[in-house]
Amino acid sequence: AQCTDERVNKVTAVLFKNYDTPEKMITLTQEELEKYIFSCGFYHNKSAHILSASRDIIEKFGGEVPDSLEKLRTLAGVGRKTANVVYAVAFGGNAIAVDTHVFRVSNRLGIAEGKTPEKVEDGLREAIPEELWSKAHHYLIYHGRRVCHSQKPDCINCTLKDYCKYFNNK
C-alpha cells in the first residue's frame, strides 16, 4: 500500500493541529508540507495536489469543501476513489470507493468482477442497494484486511466461503 489508513490518521492529526482549513493550508510552502506528509510516500506530488486543491476550494468554492462527486473530482489529486470517500464520510452520501481490498474481495466473491476499479465500482453499484453502498464499502475493506488477504486468504475460517467464487473454484 502507498500509505495505510493508520499512517494517514497519524499524519493528518499532526498536520491539522495547525493547518485545519484551506486558508491555513496555503500558508505552508510545498517543502514545509512535504515534511508533514513525507511518511505517506509520493509526498512531492501529494503536497502539490493538497496546496492546489486548497487554493481551488478557496477560489472556486468559497472555502467550503464541495459536497458533490462531480465538484470534488475537479480538485487536484482527487480521483474517483478519494471523491467517493469524502462524499460518503464527510457528507453522508451513498458511495462505494474501490481500494485494493474492495477490488480484491469483490472479484473473489464474484459480487462484482472487473479488471479496473471503475468496472468493479459499477458492478457493486448494480449488485448492492444504493442505501447500503457506504456500509458495504466498509465491510468489504474490513473483510479484506482481516480475512481475505491478498497473499494468503483465510478461506477455511471465512464465513462467506460457501458463497465465494474464489473458494469454490479452487
Please provide the spans of the model-predicted regions.
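Catalytic cores of DNA base-excision repair glycosylases
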Residues: A1-K170
